[in-house]
């Protein structure tokens, strides 16, 4: 069951784009059934956010009697570590194992050199927020995505999702050529 709860939190995070510090504070009181939205104040930025409840999230909320899954640890500070370990296992079981480059933190928080590992070993709680931003980029208005994720500047947002103006210019040029 704990892996199932971790999976549910991971799916929710991919569709609501919040930092884990805000994600794990969500409760039934954040669900507005009348408007089918989740309302919250982000912990880091103090920004108020209203996020539509998409079908994938609704199915999980329904599975948990109209609320969010239980936390993975009774100690809030331990929840992040348990969640990170659990989503690695969830991704391993889901065979998300292609080799990819990534950075891992050394003890003390300093970044280490780039390593090549199976993707599931590099997954952290941050993957949901970044996936939300990357997956909806180009499909939703950029300002809408930034409003949900809490990014205040376009440059920080584009850096966050590994996009830049050159890539956008190439895509625009390609679209123009295909339209002619």
What are the roles of these predicted feature ranges?
Residues 1-20, 24, 81:
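Basic, Lys/Arg- and aromatic-enriched nucleic-acid-binding interface segment
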Residues 29-37, 121-122, 134, 138-160:
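Short, polar N-cap/turn motifs at the start of nucleic acid-interacting alpha helices
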Residues 42-46, 142, 149-174:
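Catalytic-site neighborhood detector that most strongly recognizes the C-terminal catalytic loop/helix
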Residues 43-110, 122:
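C-terminal catalytic core of Y-nucleophile DNA break-rejoin enzymes
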Residues 96-98, 174-180:
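C-terminal secondary-structure termini that scaffold catalytic or DNA-interacting sites
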């Amino acid at each position: 069951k704990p892996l199932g709860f971790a999976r549910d939190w991971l799916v929710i995070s991919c569709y609501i784009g919040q930092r884990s510090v805000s994600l794990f504070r969500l409760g039934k009181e954040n669900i507005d059934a009348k408007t089918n939205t989740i309302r919250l104040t982000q912990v880091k930025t103090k920004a108020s956010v209203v996020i539509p409840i998409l079908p994938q999230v609704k199915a999980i909320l329904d599975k948990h009697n109209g609320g969010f899954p239980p936390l993975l640890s009774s100690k809030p500070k331990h929840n992040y570590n348990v969640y990170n370990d659990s989503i690695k296992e969830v991704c391993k079981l889901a065979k998300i194992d292609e080799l990819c480059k990534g950075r891992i933190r050394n003890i003390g928080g300093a970044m280490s050199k780039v390593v090549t590992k199976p993707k599931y070993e590099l997954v952290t709680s941050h993957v949901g927020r970044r996936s939300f931003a990357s997956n909806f980029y180009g499909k939703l208005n950029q300002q809408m995505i930034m409003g949900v994720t809490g990014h205040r500047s376009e440059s920080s947002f584009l850096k966050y999702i590994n996009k830049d103006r050159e890539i956008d210019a190439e895509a625009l040029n390609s679209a123009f050529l295909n339209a002619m």
